[in-house]
Design a protein with these regions (language model features):
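Accessory cap/linker subdomain of secreted extracellular hydrolases
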Residues: 61-62, 70, 133-233
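C-terminal, loop-rich substrate-recognition/catalytic regions characterized by aromatic stacking residues
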Residues: 276, 280-653, 659-675
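Short beta-strand/loop motif that positions the catalytic acidic residue
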Residues: 234, 240-242
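N-terminal cap/lid segment of alpha/beta-hydrolase-fold proteins
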Residues: 2-38, 407, 411-413, 426, ...
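Glycine-rich nucleophile elbow surrounding the catalytic serine of serine-hydrolase chemistry
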Residues: 124-133
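Alpha/beta-hydrolase fold nucleophile elbow
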Residues: 113-125
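Cap/lid segment of the alpha/beta-hydrolase catalytic domain
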Residues: 35-110, 159-160, 432, 438-446, ...
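Active-site-adjacent alpha-helix of alpha/beta-hydrolase-fold enzymes
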Residues: 250-263
């Protein structure tokens, strides 16, 4: 990244500005704005997230907010109620209270003497969710939004559930927010109230996973703040982006298809990162694109930002399998609209061990049967990759050993796909609850298999309504597995492989009992969204500038970070474990003399093929120290199951000066609901 300090406007920063909510709660904002805005008001841009602007998100914030301010915008970074230095308690994600607060912040922003009354919202992940959800409420000052790595569907396309199956990232994210929601504010900003605010948070926070587990089907809990329930509610222009390695790769094309506002989409090779920080690379000059977006929609500049294709996507070239990549080779392609007139769905029948060169047969052939071991999925990587070595999927050959596998013949010419593949299965199963995972891989001539995309379906959710229906063992059903969207080029000499398995642990929590899946050949099909290789890309080879931003906030790495991802197998007790460590080490924020430490551990275990032996555990430690101030929060969440129930054990401990000042435990049971 190129760091720039010479910007069109000199920038002033206010670290702690109080923003009143309508109920009297005081939210905390950090503001960057042009010095000239004292006399020449500018549009305001809000980023609204729970990740602690004072410390844990301070370095990232310092790259893009001063940059945008230097281009003529008042940028406001607000900690959600109950996080950072904002008062109150954060009880869950995307609550009505959160959105009401967002409306209050925008109203406050529009009324400031240095703001001209026009506002935008931007963010990645939670911040993008917040921007899209707030846009659907139509606050009067909001003119446009910028979204990165987001969803419009909280039930079907977030880290909780996928195809009606429970994702283990549900546990991981719950552990993350259990820790963030119980950290204290900094007394340097809030004074002696810090301790009371901290204890209020700890006293009133429950493990978020309990609520998420109690809503296992698409109900009003998930419908709330899912913009897909009413796309027409969004009436402002949308710039949407994500990455093919991210868990949130699908929403960009959905909002392009369903919104009826000016909109642009951008999907790169990235994991869960802003595009200017994108990994795997190439990262792009995203902030320059954001400035163009704001210039047009907040300032009325006629700069051609809406010219060119509606969707710009990185067409990924073939690569050997790896758990991380610095760069993904490929090229940018453009589509004039979405769905694109250039994309043709091509269906091919599944035959024994192969993908036919023709469409489905009129009658079914013999069934092909699989009952996968629990080990299938140990090399699946993370649902939402951060490109943190090694959280991308590894060589799929070991996974394929426990799967039904279908290959094309070696390709004689290149094949490119852009969009969401699907698999339609003519099937029977042996259990009333069963899961099927479908994977597409790029198989090289040496046999190595790189996963391209995947999808999961809890077959009780085959109707796609969010209301499960138990299966009748032995009965024939038709079910469609939707795979994640992707842009991928398969070269000549390679094969396209489809793999089907009945487990995908620990990415997906397994069904209550092992299930035997039978798939009928000829009447089961794979459909690929094929983009003709002769189609013009509609884009120059390098349509984006070099990534740039402001120099990051000065910080010092006091102790070394640690990243580990290990699969362990005990061949005596037939136990397996996936163990993950993400430790940022101790980082000192130089300007304020604050040391921060964050360590997260995840562990997923199973014994043999006992589907009720699986367990997941997360442990978080977050520490903040300065002079004689030393506090830390430790959380631990463990999830187990029987055939009928989930069991959750959780602990929360708060320490001040090395002494434990708060402790609470939870031991609760949640019934399984066709899951």
């Amino acid at each position: 990244m190129r760091y720039v300090s010479n910007l069109p406007h000199a920038v002033k920063e206010e670290e702690h500005v109080v923003v009143p909510a309508r109920d009297g709660t005081r939210l905390s904002a950090r503001v960057w704005r042009p010095v000239s805005s004292d006399t020449e008001p500018v549009p305001g841009v809000l980023e609204y997230i729970p990740y602690r602007k004072r410390d844990l998100s301070a370095v990232r914030d310092s790259i893009h907010h001063p940059y945008l301010a230097g281009h003529g915008y008042a940028c406001v970074r607000v900690d959600l109620r109950g996080t950072g230095e904002s008062e109150g308690v954060l009880a869950d994600e995307y609550l009505e209270q959160e959105q009401t607060d967002a409306e209050d912040v925008l109203a406050w922003l529009a009324e400031q003497p240095w703001c001209d009354g026009n506002t935008g919202m931007m963010g990645i992940s939670w911040g993008a969710f917040a921007a899209l959800q707030t846009a659907a409420r139509r606050p009067p000052s909001l003119r446009a939004v910028v979204l990165a790595s987001f969803t419009d569907d909280r039930y079907a396309d977030d880290m909780h559930y996928m195809g009606g199956a429970l994702l283990s990232d549900n546990l991981a994210e719950a552990g993350t927010m259990f820790a963030y929601a119980t950290c204290p504010p900094d007394p340097a900003l809030v004074g002696e109230r810090w301790r009371d605010m901290w204890h209020e948070r700890m006293e009133n926070t429950r493990p978020w996973i309990l609520n998420w587990l109690r809503h296992q089907r698409r109900d009003d809990y998930w419908r709330h703040a899912s913009v897909c329930e009413d796309y027409s509610a969004v009436q402002v222009p949308v710039l949407a982006s994500s990455g093919w390695a991210d868990g949130y790769s699908n929403a960009v094309t959905r909002v392009l298809e369903h919104l009826d506002v000016p909109r642009k989409g951008l999907v790169g090779p990235w994991s869960h990162k802003y595009p200017h920080l994108g990994e795997p690379g190439p990262a792009i000059g995203y902030l320059q694109e954001v400035v163009r977006w704001w210039d047009h929609w907040l300032k009325g500049v006629d700069n051609g930002v809406m010219d060119g294709p509606m969707l710009q996507a990185w067409m990924q070239d073939s690569v050997p399998p790896s758990t991380s990549y610095e760069e993904r080779p490929g090229r940018w392609v453009g589509e004039p609209s979405w769905p694109s007139p250039h994309i043709t769905p091509v269906s091919r029948a599944l035959l024994r061990h192969r993908i036919a060169a023709t469409g489905p047969a009129p009658t079914a052939g013999e069934p092909m049967t699989v009952q996968s071991p629990l080990s299938v999925g140990q090399f699946a990587g993370k649902w939402a990759s951060y490109n943190a070595p090694p959280d991308l999927p590894y060589d799929q050959r070991e996974e394929d050993g426990g799967s039904l596998v279908f290959d094309t013949e070696p390709l004689t010419e290149p094949v490119e796909i852009l969009g969401s593949p699907s698999v339609e299965l003519d099937l029977t199963v042996s259990e009333p609850v069963a899961t099927v995972a479908a994977r597409i891989s790029d198989v090289a001539p040496d046999g190595s298999a790189t996963r391209v995309t995947y999808g999961v379906l809890n077959l009780t959710h085959r109707a796609g309504t969010g209301e499960p229906e138990l299966l009748e063992p032995g009965r024939r059903y038709r079910a469609t597995v939707q795979l994640n969207g992707v842009a991928q080029a398969f070269p000549p000499g390679h094969r396209i492989r489809l793999s089907l398995s009945t487990s995908y642990w620990p990415l997906v929590w397994p069904a209550p009992r092992p299930a035997r899946l039978s798939v009928y050949e000829g009447t089961s099909t794979l459909t690929l969204p094929v983009r003709p290789t002769a189609e013009p890309d509609e884009l120059p080879q390098q349509p984006f500038g070099e990534p740039e931003g402001c120099p990051p906030l000065a910080s010092t790495q006091v102790t070394a970070p640690e990243e580990r991802w290990e699969v362990r197998r005990d061949l005596i007790g037939y136990r397996s474990a996936l163990e993950i460590v993400k430790d940022r080490g101790t980082v000192r924020i130089d300007d304020i003399g604050l040391d921060t430490g964050l360590r997260a551990e995840e562990r997923y275990t199973a014994t043999a093929d006992d589907f009720t032996s699986v367990a997941g555990e997360t442990a978080w430690t977050m520490r903040f120290t300065r002079d004689d101030w030393d506090v830390r929060v430790e959380t631990r969440t463990r999830m187990r199951c029987s055939e009928e129930e989930f069991h959750v054990d959780a602990t929360l401990d708060g320490y001040e000066g090395g002494r434990r000042v708060f402790s609470r435990t939870w031991n609760e049971t949640v019934p399984r609901d066709a899951l």
